[in-house]
């Protein structure tokens, strides 16, 4: 690795930066995620942003001869890009060392490393919700100065080609009550998931079901009608385990479509709204749906269980990440491969298709000693050319760029019934629907626990009042 002083284009510093199986790690780097407080290990770091050190004209080979270390978890995105890494090295002269960590251990390792301030890994895969945890203590670099520096960023990069909801979902100023889209650009979206409904189209056709329900009550009734316990067939699979990840896919998507919100801001404090009339009514219906049409072991379900049941032909519908179900329809991937379809799920009472998303992103370590080569890597990995090539492999869904979706992905996914139409229906209102706040993982896990308690017999209104009171207290500490 070249010394910082000897690398061209820098004055002195060059620093920066669940589907557990190959076929579909959905948003879920989330499955059994140990959450460490952002400030609980290690202190705040104040590493200077490295973008201003890069001068002169843009040149992909400006950091040639350097080496970067990146941290990833096995995932279809990672697998789609792995064969392309040699092209990055040929383009830039930068060598890339990849460390792969199993999803179950990934965020624990990353959290510990960032808190220690070692700068060992220059760039890493990051779920957008983790920005709210890793950003406030200064562990990740603001990438906006890099985007704005024409010496560091190719004029053809076209950041605005990335869907607006994704760009918004990776910005925040860390101020209580302020929405996403404010503050720094803490990561660059790389691949993402809309939480919508996948269904067994072959079985629907067999039953003569041609009209898919466009309101939640009809959706619940369809799920019940599809359920026959004697034939080991049930209507709807969703996550139900005692994890924050139970809330963010189908539950949160339909929750906001029905007009409920998680928090409001009164000018001073966030106020939890899980006990509002709309929230209570929706939650009662959601839990009733699990009892009458969900898996009998719903309280243990994470996304691999839900999508696995769809692929096996046990679940007739799944309300979860589209890119988690997409691979199940590929030849040989599941018993129901070729039989699946997608639709947005029921609209809200006012016809809205608000959708909660998960995005895998690339972020840079604020303590990296190799910031220019790390930025060149992030720029390449999220750029048009490499993303088009990655999508060609057939397991990369969904691309974050409009241009890649409109060309390569539309061609690759053309035979996936309803997938493209569903994507285009929801993309205009797909974003992180949660209110950003630094206690997200703790309070959202508490929400999942409350759902389990209601499933077990607790009164919904009183249990949600208790949850709201506790969460209001936690988020304002």
From Swiss-Prot:
Induction: Up-regulated during growth on erythritol, D-threitol or L-threitol relative to growth on glycerol. The keyword Nucleus does not apply. Gene3D superfamilies: Periplasmic binding protein-like II. Keywords: Signal, Sugar transport, Transport. The keyword Transport applies. Disruption phenotype: Cells lacking this gene are defective for growth on erythritol or on L-threitol. Part of an ABC transporter complex involved in erythritol/L-threitol import. Binds erythritol and L-threitol. Functions in the transport for the degradation pathways of erythritol and L-threitol, that allow M.smegmatis to grow on these compounds as the sole carbon source. This is Erythritol/L-threitol-binding protein. It comes from Mycolicibacterium smegmatis (strain ATCC 700084 / mc(2)155).
